[in-house]
UniProtKB/Swiss-Prot annotation:
Subcellular compartments: Cellular thylakoid membrane
Pfam families xrefs: PSII
One MF term in the entry's GO annotations: chlorophyll binding
Species per Swiss-Prot/TrEMBL record: Prochlorococcus marinus (strain SARG / CCMP1375 / SS120)
Protein name: Divinyl chlorophyll a/b light-harvesting protein PcbG
UniProt keyword terms in alphabetical order: Chlorophyll, Chromophore, Membrane, Photosynthesis, Photosystem I, Thylakoid, Transmembrane, Transmembrane helix
Miscellaneous field: This low-light-adapted strain contains 8 pcb genes.
Cellular component GO terms held in the UniProt record: photosystem I; plasma membrane-derived thylakoid membrane
């Protein structure tokens, strides 16, 4: 995993994925499935928690809810004018996520303890063998990247079709309605620069439809193509590693967290006022933060919008630090050398004195 010192370093049990997953393609699958199980469990458990304390007589935005407003935005729970009329649908969603978390957890354990550590252990003609990888094999890595892009495209298609067939919550109408996507490329291009002010559900769905096509095309491209020319250091030779992938993943997560924070703080189309509360006011103290503008809230109460915005921002900040840390390690920087530097300085001072 590390690109400095001994590349075959042994990790202790508490290093978790560093020792159990690094350079083991089969264990990568196990880790992915198990992490999906954790996400499903968190989603289901939080839905039940919020459902137990939801009060239909109070504005949803003032109750500090996070998961239920998202489900309402998807048109679930018989949402009307910001109030759920059929919470049984939400209960079904929560229980389904909890059941799936157990299934995913079992799948993670199955791949961890029953199946091979490395996919190259399977016959060369098997499907599993196609997804083996080596960090210095660009053709295999781009093949796997292509499949990731196809799954992302499928997620976008699912969302667009859900809005078109079932419908999503329209804050203007105060009801669920079917939304046809607006695939206007000029509109999509312009919204790169003013995405915080987007006010049309049709435009939002059009953006997702475009992303579905773009990612699907990218997925097919990466699956069918191979590295052109010499695979040199400029293209990532001897640089790509589990830690490098972790670094870039953290950068992507930080970027999306920052965008989500800015969007949630100010946009009322994707984050309706009757579901998340009023827009927030930006403040700058020791660190940037956002505060509620609703004077009717109790002194110690916060809207769901305030929770979402601030948590996303600070998580994004720490993800960014993780990106720099792991990125520098992937480039070969040994952070232990900093401690050695100070030790040498202390030794030099002692000698001079």
């Amino acid at each position: 995993m590390q690109t400095y010192g001994d590349p075959n370093v042994s990790y202790a049990w508490y290093a978790a994925n560093a020792g159990a997953v690094t350079n083991k393609s089969g264990r990568f699958i196990s880790s992915h499935i198990a992490h999906t199980g954790l996400i499903c469990f968190g989603a289901g458990a939080n839905t039940l928690f919020e459902l137990a304390r939801y009060n239909p007589d109070l504005p949803m935005g003032s109750q500090g809810l996070v998961v239920l407003p998202h489900l309402a935005g998807l048109g679930l729970g018989g949402i009307s004018n910001g109030v759920f009329t059929d919470t049984y649908q939400l209960l079904v969603v929560a229980i389904l996520h909890l059941i799936l978390s157990g299934v995913y957890g079992g799948g993670g354990m199955l791949h961890a303890f029953r199946y091979e550590e490395k996919l190259e252990s399977y016959p060369a003609t098997s499907r599993a063998n196609k997804f083996k990888f080596d960090w210095n094999d660009p053709d295999r890595l781009t093949f796997i990247l292509g499949h990731h892009l196809l799954f992302l495209a499928a997620g976008n298609i699912q969302f667009v079709e859900w809005a078109r067939v079932h419908g999503i919550y329209d804050p203007v109408a105060g009801a669920v309605r079917q939304v046809e996507y607006n695939l206007d490329l000029g509109m999509i291009w312009n919204h790169q620069f003013d995405f915080l002010s987007i006010s049309s559900l049709e435009d939002i769905m059009g953006g997702h439809a475009f992303l579905a096509f773009f990612m699907a095309a990218g997925g097919v491209f990466h699956i069918l193509t191979k590295n052109y020319g010499e695979y040199n250091s400029f293209k990532g030779a001897d640089l790509l590693s589990a830690e490098f992938v972790l670094s870039t993943s953290l950068a992507g997560a930080a970027y999306t967290a920052f965008v989500a924070a800015l969007w949630c703080a100010s946009n009322t189309t994707i984050y309706p006022v009757d579901l998340y509360g009023d827009v927030l006011q930006f403040k700058l103290g020791i660190a940037p933060y956002w505060i509620d503008t609703d004077s009717s809230l109790a002194a110690d109460a916060h809207t769901g919008r305030a929770w979402l915005t601030n948590v996303h921002f600070f998580i994004g900040f720490f993800y960014l630090q993780g990106h720099f840390f792991h990125g520098l390690r992937a480039l070969g920087f040994d952070f232990k050398s900093i401690g050695k530097l100070f030790d040498n300085l202390e030794t030099s001072e002692t000698t001079l004195n």
